[in-house]
Amino acid sequence: MRKALVFLGILALGLAFAQVRTFDQIKKSGEIRIGTEGAFPPFNYFDEKNQLTGFEVDLGNAIAKKLGLKPKWIAQAFDSLLIQLNQGRFDFVIASHGITEERAKAVDFTNPHYCTGGIIVSKKGGPKTKKDLEGKVVGVQIGTTYMEAAQKIPGVKEVRTYQKDPEALQDLLTGRIDAWITDRFVAKEAIKERKLEGTLQLGELVFQEKVAMAVAKGNKSVLDALNKALADLMKDGTYAQISKKWFGEDVRCR
C-alpha cells in the first residue's frame, strides 16, 4: 500500500547496530515481535476500545499462530518502522509497505500479502484523473508512494503533505485541497465509515503496487518461516477468510 521514501543511509546505520534474532532464537523465546503503525485503517489501527485491529493485525496473528508463537505487537510511527526493524526492535514488520527496488536494498521482503494501488479521491464533480489534477492542490501522507506519485503528475499546482491520512481527508472535506491520493482500500473504508458516499467520489488509480512484510536484511531464517506460513494460510483458506472479513473480497496478488 505505502512505500515510504526511506533514506538508505539511515537504514544502513540501523544495520550497523542490528541485533536481530534468527528464527531459532525466536522459537526458543516463544514470542515473535511484530512492528506496525496502528494508524492505517482498515489495515492496522486502534479501535474505539484502543485495541489494535485490522486486516494486517488479523493476518499477523494468524501467521504467529501458524508458527506456534505468541505475537507481541509494537506500534510505531510509520517512517521509523524499517529503521527500528534493522535495529532489532521487531522480528518483522507488517504495515502496508510496498515493495520497491530502493527499499529492497536495505530490508528483505516476503512474498506479497496483498496487492493494491493509489487512487484519486475528490468531492463529487471534482478531479478524477491525473489530467484533471492540473492546476489543483493534492493532499498525501508524508513519506509515502502517494506523495512520490503526486509529485510526478504533470501540472499539479501543489502537493500538500500530512502526517496521517485522516488529516488529508479532513482538508478535502473542508475544501483546503482539491484531491487526496491514498490507498484504494483506505479510501473505500473512509467513505463507508464516515457515510460520505454522497459527498466523495473515487477516481482512477495513479499506480498499482505489491505489498509485503519486511524482515531485517539477510535474516533468511525469519524470511523463509514467514513465507511458508503465509503460503500455508493462503492454501488452507485462512487468508481468504480474513481478507473477505475486511474487504469483502480476496486481495491476494493474482
Predicted regions and their residues:
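Extracytoplasmic small-molecule ligand-binding "clamshell" domains
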Residues: 20-96, 236
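Ligand-binding clefts/hinges and TM-proximal coupling segments of bilobed small-molecule sensing domains
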Residues: 20-22, 145-162, 198-203, 228-254
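Bilobed "Venus flytrap"/periplasmic-binding protein-like clamshell domains
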Residues: 33-41, 52-65, 116-167, 184-186, ...
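Extended ligand-binding regions for polar small-molecule ligands
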Residues: 58-66, 136-137, 142-145, 210-249
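Acidic, polar ligand-binding/catalytic clefts
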Residues: 61, 65, 70-132, 198, ...
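Short helix-initiation/N-cap motifs at beta->coil->alpha
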Residues: 72-83, 125, 142-145, 160-174, ...
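A ligand-binding cleft/hinge motif common to bilobed small-molecule-binding domains
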Residues: 97-105, 149-152, 173, 178-208
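Periplasmic-binding protein-like
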Residues: 114-121, 184, 188-231, 249-254
